């Protein structure tokens, strides 16, 4: 676009107007493409939010959202780690095989939750980037 814009700057009269119209048409096409990407990203964000809520409910927690942002992230993740610590304390100084399985299952759920949060954040950031480009 910059080269076309610089070329248009050197022109005058009807030639300049024609070149500016070409630039405008190209920009409108780009905006439509970005808007289509944004719409698709919004669809993925809904899916990511469902996945995030599913992973959270597996840990008996829930997130609240404010304009797409997770508004209770700190408190919720603190409660998740507190649950893990409470489970560890309940086992005492030694952990048997059954207790280790419980801990591993909890750790797996926590990892799934963290992955879901990361995916949600990436999609939300993509939408913000597309908004800035539009």
What is each stretch, according to the model?
Residues 1-3, 125-134:
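Short acidic DE-rich linear segments
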Residues 22, 29, 65-68, 72, ...:
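A structural signal for alpha-helical segments
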Residues 1-33:
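Short, charge-rich amphipathic alpha-helices with coiled-coil/heptad character
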Residues 27-42, 47, 86-122:
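Long amphipathic alpha-helical coiled-coil segments
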Residues 35-73, 80:
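Extended alpha-helical coiled-coil "stalk/arm" regions
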């Amino acid at each position: 676009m910059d080269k076309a814009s610089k070329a248009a700057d050197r022109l005058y009269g009807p030639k300049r107007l024609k070149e500016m119209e070409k630039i405008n048409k190209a920009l409108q096409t780009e905006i439509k493409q970005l808007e289509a990407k944004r719409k698709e990203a919004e669809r993925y964000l809904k899916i990511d939010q469902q996945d995030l809520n599913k992973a959270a409910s597996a840990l008996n927690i829930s997130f609240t959202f404010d304009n797409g942002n997770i508004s209770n992230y700190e408190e919720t993740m603190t409660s998740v780690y507190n649950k893990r610590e409470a489970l560890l304390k309940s086992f005492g100084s030694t952990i048997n095989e059954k207790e280790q399985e419980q801990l591993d299952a909890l750790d797996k759920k926590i990892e799934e939750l963290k992955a879901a949060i990361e995916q949600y954040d990436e999609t939300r950031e993509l939408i913000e980037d597309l908004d800035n480009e539009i």
